[in-house]
């Protein structure tokens, strides 16, 4: 396709006098800020290819750097705006369609209308891809750009022809009728549009309704059907109908229940049998193999898949895990209407709980291959706009929101009491913990709290005054780090500036989110650094110093695994003394073969030497002595006793460096070597680019700047005397291939993840604690302990790591128990409960960061078998297959002891005895 130019210019055309890069940057920044300060529904934004936008950013940024540093810019002015890499190849140039699954910030950027107009004015190009700003949310309103409008497949009932219709998800049903009728030529009074999801008539849409398409549960790429009054074609009459099944989301929980094997039911849905349990509790002697059937004989529920509505695999995975959580299913398959809290300002008027309960009933009905969770997703998007649209999300984030939302919708506490918290006053931990748990329960009472919430102890210690603060907080799940994500191994080569030892590589373990100070501390311990010594860290690239690491609090994430880092072991210069760095580069001579006119070249090799020197003038002899000291441990044992006198073949004169190759070039003119015969080496003064090379003699005087650079010429004599291989064999910071192999062999246990979660660690600099004794914010040490464990225990494995420089997914295999997960040693409050757990569900993530695919494993406890839920596809799976490196969220249920089981049964008998007594009186 040809990029249009004039069609997309401003009315006044392209500027005859283009702005400078600095002015362009300033104008775009000001217009963007102005737009962010005036967000309104319907504001226009334009999609721009990230590839083109990056080239523009480099152009304006490099030009700005040129102004401040005086260095020339290497980024050229970009050509016309080109969006063709982000649109479908067969798109109409007047109606371009974005490629699916694009990621903002990686594939495209969004700019306000005024910024787009300016960019087109300066660069022309296109095509323009216009999108609208929409406002979403029920309680908390948030703005977002609808990058992918709703795409619907319209089937014309007259001839079964199909047409694509695109509308914003907030467009009304009335607007949909207008557009469909305009496209098909059907009068609005004769048109009937059906929700035709899965090629079935799920509900007739009201032509006068202002309800949005999203609220009507219409989703991306689904079918709609238009029929016309007065036509009774075979096509229209053949269309199947299921009534109005999914047209509306129920506002009351259904009182119908899934039939339980054995016995009649009460009007409220409870079984009359006293030991009723949809999912019998596991005891240490009973693994559930002989449990009762969930449905009638020959029927099996819980094996329905969930249709993918467009990148909703993350939601389906989390839902299947919850849909196989025994106490949650027991609760929602009964009558829970009395627990709905419609007045909770933190809830969703009960609508989320009702939608979830309705979905669970469908999943546990027999005879269903797959269920489309459209009504549930509609409610989810209304109350959690971050999950609207069709981008990939995180199953754990969805799970966290859903559990919290269900709790608030089902919270039996209608008016939360105010309870003044008492100070612990050195009271026993169990007394304080129980008091805080009762306070929590007085304000939060739901099936979610009863089943899923535990309590941990948090201890903070002030590093200055030693003040100890202990709190007890509830938790819904445990987000445990993978130990490999907490630390990293780094290999650094240490050079001894006094010449006492050969260069030595050291591998140290440091916090992954640590600082340069952490690395220097670990390295100092490894190499037995003396108190009067220091380490200077630097990155070596192309045989030159690329950068120094001198700010202690800088993040280690700036150092990549494939870089070469060295540390120079230096004697500390007395405080108050002025110091400068002396960099010593190494050059080896090679006779040019192809171009004899160029004479001889010197190519840089090895690792530079760096040391501190005083700012007093240095002579050539001083520098020669420093070089001799560095090289002394490299002296070959049987090296000839020849002293270098500068008479070797080839010389360095005023030379330049080829920046791309690192080669120093000199003309063929001979240099008088008599003046530097006293020096052990041929030394040349150079600059940071390797330019302005000048030879040094013994009597030369140099006034050191911040950094002074010299180059040592290595000829045959130097190579005979010294082993230069010690300068060339720098290891990388981390060998990734070796690490990956080692990780797979050793793996990680779930216990090591839990121990890393509970380990004492200092708070981050952005998460300081206010010490009540010091009256200051302190970087306190924090320690967590498990205090109270719930019946349903969820582990979230933190596989995704984010930092300023790196986004990554850890595919390390975590070895987690399927049976007999014993957590008793990690629980501080031993109260006689069982701390044995059995795995019953797993949310899996396959692929990389920002995409991939989610599935779920779940155990059907009725028949003691595991199943794989991959969206709508459900298949049986061996228990041995569920442990793999894709495991992301683990669901465990408590294995009760025999005593606990008997106590629970007695409590249940009493409950149902009271219920039967109440019914007898009522009759």
Curated annotation (Swiss-Prot):
Reaction it catalyzes: Thiol-dependent hydrolysis of ester, thioester, amide, peptide and isopeptide bonds formed by the C-terminal Gly of ubiquitin (a 76-residue protein attached to proteins as an intracellular targeting signal)
Family classification: Belongs to the peptidase C19 family.
Protein name (Swiss-Prot/TrEMBL): Ubiquitin carboxyl-terminal hydrolase 10
Keyword Protease carried by entry: yes
Gene giving rise to this polypeptide: UBP10
EC category: hydrolase
Species for this entry: Arabidopsis thaliana (Mouse-ear cress)
GO MF annotation terms: cysteine-type deubiquitinase activity
SMART domains: DUSP
Keywords, sorted A to Z: Hydrolase, Protease, Thiol protease, Ubl conjugation pathway
CDD domains for this protein: Peptidase_C19R
SUPFAM superfamilies with a match to the protein in the record: Cysteine proteinases, DUSP-like
């Amino acid at each position: 396709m040809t990029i249009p130019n004039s069609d997309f210019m401003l009315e006044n055309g392209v500027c005859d006098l283009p702005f400078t890069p600095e002015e362009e940057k300033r104008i775009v920044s000001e217009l963007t800020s102005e737009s962010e300060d005036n967000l309104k529904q319907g504001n226009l934004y334009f999609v721009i290819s990230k590839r083109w936008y990056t080239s523009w950013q480099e152009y304006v940024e490099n030009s700005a750097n040129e102004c401040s540093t005086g260095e020339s810019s290497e980024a050229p002015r970009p050509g016309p705006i080109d969006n063709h890499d982000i649109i479908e190849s067969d798109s109409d140039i007047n109606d371009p369609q974005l490629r699916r699954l694009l990621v903002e910030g990686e594939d495209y950027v969004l700019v306000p209308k005024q910024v787009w107009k300016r960019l087109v004015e300066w660069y022309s190009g296109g095509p323009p891809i216009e999108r609208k700003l929409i406002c979403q949310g029920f309680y908390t309103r948030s703005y977002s750009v609808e990058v992918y409008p709703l795409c619907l497949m319209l089937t014309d009932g007259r001839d079964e022809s199909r047409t694509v219709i695109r509308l914003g998800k907030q467009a009304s049903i009335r607007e949909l009728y207008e557009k469909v009728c305009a496209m098909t030529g059907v009068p609005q009074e004769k048109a009937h549009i059906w929700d035709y999801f899965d090629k079935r008539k799920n509900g007739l849409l009201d032509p006068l309704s202002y309800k949005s398409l999203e609220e009507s549960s219409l989703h991306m790429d689904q079918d709609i059907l238009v029929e016309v009054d007065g036509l009774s074609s075979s096509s229209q009459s053949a269309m199947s109908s299921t009534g109005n099944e999914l047209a509306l989301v129920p506002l009351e929980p259904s009182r119908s229940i899934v039939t339980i094997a054995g016995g009649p039911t009460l009007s409220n849905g409870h079984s009359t049998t006293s030991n009723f349990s949809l999912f019998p509790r596991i005891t240490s002697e009973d693994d559930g193999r002989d449990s009762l059937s969930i449905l009638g004989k020959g029927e099996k529920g819980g094996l329905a898949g969930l249709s993918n509505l467009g990148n909703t695999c993350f939601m389906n995975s989390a839902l299947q895990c919850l849909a196989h959580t025994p106490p949650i299913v027991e609760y929602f398959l009964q009558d829970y209407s009395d627990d709905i809290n419609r007045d909770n300002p933190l809830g969703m008027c009960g609508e989320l709980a009702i939608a979830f309960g309705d979905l669970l009933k469908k999943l546990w009905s027999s005879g269903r291959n797959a269920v489309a969770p459209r009504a549930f997703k509609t409610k989810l998007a209304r109350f959690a706009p971050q999950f609207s649209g069709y981008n990939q999300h995180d199953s754990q984030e969805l799970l966290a929101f859903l559990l919290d939302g269900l709790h608030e919708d089902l919270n039996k506490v209608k008016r939360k009491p105010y309870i003044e918290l008492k100070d612990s006053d050195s009271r026993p931990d169990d007394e304080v913990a129980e008091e805080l748990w009762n306070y929590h329960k007085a304000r939060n009472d739901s099936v979610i709290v009863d089943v899923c919430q535990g309590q941990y102890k948090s201890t903070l210690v002030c590093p200055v005054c030693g003040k100890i603060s202990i709190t007890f907080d509830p938790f819904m799940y445990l987000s445990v780090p993978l130990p490999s994500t907490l630390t990293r191994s780094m290999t650094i080569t240490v050079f001894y500036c006094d010449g006492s030892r050969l260069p030595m590589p050291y591998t140290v373990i440091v916090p992954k989110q640590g600082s340069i100070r952490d690395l220097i501390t670990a390295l100092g311990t490894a190499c037995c650094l003396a108190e009067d010594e220091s380490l200077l860290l630097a990155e070596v690239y192309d045989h030159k110093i690329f950068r120094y690491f001198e700010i202690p609090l800088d993040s280690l994430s700036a150092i990549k695994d494939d870089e070469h880092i060295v540390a120079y072991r230096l004697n500390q210069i007395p405080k108050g003394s002025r110091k400068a760095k002396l960099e010593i580069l190494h050059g080896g001579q090679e006779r040019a073969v192809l171009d004899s006119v160029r004479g001889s070249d010197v190519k840089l090799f090895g690792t530079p030497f760096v040391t501190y020197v005083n700012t007093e003038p240095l002579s050539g002899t001083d520098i020669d002595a420093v070089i001799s000291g560095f090289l002394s441990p490299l002296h070959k044992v049987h090296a000839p006793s020849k002293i270098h006198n500068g008479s070797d073949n080839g010389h360095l004169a005023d030379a330049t460096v080829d920046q791309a190759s690192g080669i120093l070039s000199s003309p063929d003119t001979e240099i008088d070597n008599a003046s530097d015969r006293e020096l052990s080496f041929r030394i040349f003064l150079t600059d940071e680019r390797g330019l302005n090379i000048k030879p040094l003699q013994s009597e030369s005087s140099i006034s050191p700047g911040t950094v002074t650079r010299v180059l040592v010429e290595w000829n045959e004599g130097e190579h005979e005397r010294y082993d230069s291989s010690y300068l060339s064999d720098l290891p990388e910071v981390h060998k990734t291939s070796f690490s990956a192999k080692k990780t797979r062999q050793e793996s990680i246990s779930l216990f090591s993840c839990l121990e890393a979660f509970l380990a004492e660690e200092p708070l981050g600099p952005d998460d300081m604690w206010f010490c009540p004794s010091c009256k200051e914010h302190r970087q306190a040490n924090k320690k967590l302990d498990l205090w109270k464990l719930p019946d349903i225990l969820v582990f979230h494995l933190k596989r995704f790591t984010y930092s300023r420089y790196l986004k990554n997914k850890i595919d390390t295999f975590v070895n987690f128990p399927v049976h007999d997960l014993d957590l008793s040693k990690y629980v501080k409050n031993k109260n006689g409960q069982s701390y044995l757990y059995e795995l019953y569900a797993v949310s899996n993530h396959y692929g990389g960061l920002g995409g991939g695919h989610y599935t779920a494993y779940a155990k059907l406890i009725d028949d003691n078998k595991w199943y794989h839920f991959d969206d709508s596809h459900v298949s049986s799976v061996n228990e041995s297959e569920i442990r793999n490196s894709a495991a992301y969220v683990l669901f465990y249920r408590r294995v009760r002891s025999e005593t606990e089981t008997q106590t629970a049964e007695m409590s249940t008998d009493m409950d149902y005895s009271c219920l039967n007594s109440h019914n007898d009186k009522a009759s």
